[in-house]
Amino acid sequence: MAAPVMSAFGRLQGLIRTERSLLTHVQSRCIQTTSVCLKNRAARVRVGKGDKPVTYEAAHPPHYIAHRKGWLSQHTGNLDGEGGAAERTIEDVFIRRFIFGTFHGCLANEIVIKRRANLLIICAIFIRKMPTQKFYFLIGYTETLLSFLYKCPVKLEVQTVEEKVIYKYL
């Protein structure tokens, strides 16, 4: 009877010694030398062999905003003393994803979202890939659903083109 108790006591002492040695080992090593995984990316299309078609928006890097290209979201939330910029950004992301999913494969360029007082205007250029009746139905569906969701009038300003407009090749 004494032998099993002693062996259990011996195992417990061994575990305590191991734990103490691990604690001193962990406390002495406090620097990690791993490679950094957060890499910066350029927000532009890289110049290649000249076989990559790009649109006007993608051809110019972001520092040309307000010089050669415009803002894709126009509202007064970023002015001094105005609130709600974060909420508008989340709304813009939802609207862009909703329209991309509704008109799948038909977007020719980026969507421009304008807010004027209580009116939400969405400007888009689409490629003619579907029948006109279906296209008009999806426009009405989008306007109605977003109007009920945001509780304000939503208007889609739409232009259609035969194929994607290519600005230049990079």
UniProtKB/Swiss-Prot annotation:
Can you quote a single GO CC term? mitochondrial small ribosomal subunit
Q: Any idea which residues the transit peptide spans?
A: 1-30
What highest taxon heads this organism's lineage? Eukaryota
State where it is primarily located: mitochondrion
Listed A to Z, the keywords are: Mitochondrion, Ribonucleoprotein, Ribosomal protein, Transit peptide
Is Mitochondrion among this UniProt entry's keywords? yes
Q: Which InterPro entries match?
A: Ribosomal_uS3m (IPR026146)
PANTHER family in the record: MITOCHONDRIAL 28S RIBOSOMAL PROTEIN S24, SMALL RIBOSOMAL SUBUNIT PROTEIN US3M
User: What family is this protein classified in?
Assistant: Belongs to the universal ribosomal protein uS3 family.
Q: Can you name this protein?
A: Small ribosomal subunit protein uS3mB
What organism does the UniProt record list as the source?
Xenopus laevis (African clawed frog)
